[in-house]
């Protein structure tokens, strides 16, 4: 039922507030737990993203393979963030101009477009497979996620290679 998309958009807003306010509330109460909070926050973020992508793939909105492609792009950026946190002590949540807030707003906008536009009925036969317009939008989102990952990796790889140069090998 298409009306559940409003419920999912509400769930995204609820998640947004919970994700944003938990650390603020802990700091206000002076009960912050930086290590445990980081652990819980980011493992639950990964689980939430898996559930969102699974929901997309199980719905008529998007093919499962496209939803998993988006998930793979998101997880690559997440893993990259955690590696950079350890190696260069920089916790980066925004890539390009795309951060968690923009992603949530984009998901809410896509839900709204799916409800109010006839775009959900638009389908294309590409290489013998049926692709809906939202599948194509999903592939575009996945491509953007992977391009952000590759461009940031390339930039950081150069800087880290200079910071930690190869050592000569003497057998």
Question: Positions of the model-derived regions?
Answer:
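Hydrophobic alpha-helical transmembrane segments
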Residues: 1-5, 9, 52-171
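S-adenosyl-L-methionine-dependent methyltransferase catalytic core, i.e., the SAM/SAH-binding region
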Residues: 19
